[in-house]
């Protein structure tokens, strides 16, 4: 879809200026092209561009640069002067050390005696030269003396040795396995040769090391010769089974500790196998004996443990019967057992059985005292006052709010019911709730009547009486 062209508001003068500028640029381009073709290069164009903000310098930069240049020139001058002064001083010191003074008066101006220093230096040089000459002379004398001693020893060894009285003491020269020339008495020669032979056996080069000194053709030839010898030996032997050692042929693989290299000879191989079988049987027999001994020891130990368990069970049974008799308040004699009639099942439902357990490391009836509590005073008494008396003595200011006791009115029916405990004495039946009582003492002191058909019970008027009673018992 073609869009309509918007009319441009351009004056005639601007169009004429644009056309003139275009014509001028075309003429300039033609002139540059003609100059380039003719080999004449025109002047570079001068760009009248506006300088950017980065090309501008800060104020005072040029003045500071001039000051820095002047300061550097001054520093360079002072450096040159100081260098000249130092060079003059070095030359003067060199002359003084050599003794070249301009005047004796000038020499007295300095604190250092350069003349004495020159004399001392010359003396040191003379001493060093003398010591060096003496050391060189001593070394020469020592070398000459050593040479004379060697000559004397040779002359003594060759001329002054007396002739041997016995032929076995005659000195003999021989060459050992390492190619060294040796001298010894004739009587020591056999032992030395034997030692040399042993040493040569130790220094035997293995075939693996010899291979590195051979070429490939020589190695193949040696392998072929070895194979031919083995085949000849195999042809001489009778036909039989082939073993691993027959085909191993210098195998480089290490087969471990459990591998045993049997001999290739049949008789020797059978002998080795019999020996190994005998050793295996001895090992199995010893292992079986050791296992039997372990089983016997284990059986003896189990028997001992069973006896100990039986003894502990007997002791626990006896202790259990004694504890039951203490809980019931009756001391039974094991020699004269008496049959006690069992209570009816209806009475058991309303009884509470109490089992008193005491420590075995303490006496019955006596509380256990720890090691760190011995010698201390303790009171093992019971509360002598009831809860009602304690509440009466309490200051009403510290009493709890009255609404806490609203829900306790329902417990009246429970408190009216009598509480009973088996095994109590009949003397405890008539005690009232308002009096302080000790039912545990009466319970343990008064035995149960044998003629009664069932065990007497203890009745409690209130819940507090029952709780205090069980606190005293336990």
UniProtKB/Swiss-Prot annotation:
PANTHER family tied to this protein: COILED-COIL DOMAIN-CONTAINING PROTEIN 174
Amino acid composition bias (Polar residues), ranges on this chain: 410-419
The keyword Phosphoprotein is annotated on this UniProt entry: yes
Region (Disordered): 39-86, 129-170, 309-372, 389-461
Bias (Acidic residues): 148-157
Residues recorded as bearing Phosphoserine in the entry: 206
CC terms in the record's Gene Ontology section: nucleus
Protein name: Coiled-coil domain-containing protein 174
Compositional bias (Basic and acidic residues): 64-86, 129-142, 316-327, 356-372
Source domain of life: Eukaryota
Task of the protein: Probably involved in neuronal development.
Chief site of localization: nucleus
Biased amino acid composition, Low complexity: 430-453
UniProt xrefs under InterPro entries: CCDC174-like
Cellular localisation: Nucleus
Pfam annotation, one family: DUF4078
Record has Chloroplast as a keyword: no
Stretches assigned to coiled coil: 64-98, 276-317
Keywords attached to this entry: Coiled coil, Nucleus, Phosphoprotein
């Amino acid at each position: 879809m073609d869009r309509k062209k918007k009319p441009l508001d351009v004056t005639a003068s601007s169009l004429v200026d644009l056309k003139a500028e275009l014509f001028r640029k075309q003429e300039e381009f033609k002139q540059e092209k003609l100059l380039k073709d003719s080999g004449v290069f025109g002047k570079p164009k001068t760009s009248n561009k506006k300088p950017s903000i980065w090309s501008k310098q800060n104020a005072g930069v040029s003045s500071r640069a001039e000051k820095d240049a002047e300061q550097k020139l001054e520093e360079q001058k002072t450096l040159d002067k100081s260098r000249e002064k130092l060079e003059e001083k070095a030359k003067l010191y060199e002359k003084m050390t050599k003794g070249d003074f301009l005047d004796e008066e000038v020499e007295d101006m300095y604190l250092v005696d350069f003349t004495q220093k020159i004399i001392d230096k010359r003396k040191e040089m003379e001493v060093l030269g003398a010591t060096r000459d003496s050391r060189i002379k001593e070394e020469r004398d020592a070398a000459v003396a050593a040479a004379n001693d060697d000559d004397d020893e040779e002359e003594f060894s060759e001329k002054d040795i007396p002739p041997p009285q016995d032929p076995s003491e005659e000195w003999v020269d021989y060459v050992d396995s390492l190619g060294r020339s040796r001298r010894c008495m004739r009587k020591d020669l056999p032992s030395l040769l034997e030692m040399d032979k042993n040493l040569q056996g130790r220094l035997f080069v293995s075939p693996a090391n010899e291979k590195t000194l051979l070429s490939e053709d020589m190695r193949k030839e040696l392998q072929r010769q070895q194979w031919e010898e083995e085949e000849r030996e195999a042809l001489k032997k009778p036909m039989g089974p082939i073993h691993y050692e027959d085909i191993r042929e210098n195998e480089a693989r290490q087969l471990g500790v459990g591998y045993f290299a049997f001999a290739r000879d049949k008789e020797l191989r059978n002998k080795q196998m019999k020996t190994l079988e005998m050793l295996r049987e001895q090992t199995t027999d010893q292992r079986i004996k050791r296992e039997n001994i372990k089983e016997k020891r284990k059986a003896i130990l189990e028997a001992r443990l069973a006896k100990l368990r039986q003894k502990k069970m007997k002791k626990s049974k006896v202790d259990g019967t004694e504890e039951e008799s203490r809980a019931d308040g009756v001391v039974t004699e094991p020699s004269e057992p008496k049959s006690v009639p069992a209570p009816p099942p209806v009475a058991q439902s309303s009884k509470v059985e109490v089992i008193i357990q005491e420590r075995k490391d303490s006496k019955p009836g006596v509380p256990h005292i720890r090691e760190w509590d011995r010698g201390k005073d303790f009171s093992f008494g019971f509360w002598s006052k009831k809860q009602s008396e304690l509440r009466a003595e309490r200051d009403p200011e510290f009493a709890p709010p009255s609404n806490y006791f609203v829900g306790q009115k329902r417990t009246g029916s429970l408190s009216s019911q009598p509480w009973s405990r088996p095994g109590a004495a009949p003397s405890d039946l008539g005690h009232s709730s308002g009096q302080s009582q000790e039912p545990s003492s009466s319970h343990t002191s008064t035995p149960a009547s044998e003629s009664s058909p069932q065990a007497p019970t203890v009745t409690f008027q209130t819940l507090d009486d029952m709780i205090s009673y069980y606190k005293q018992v336990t």
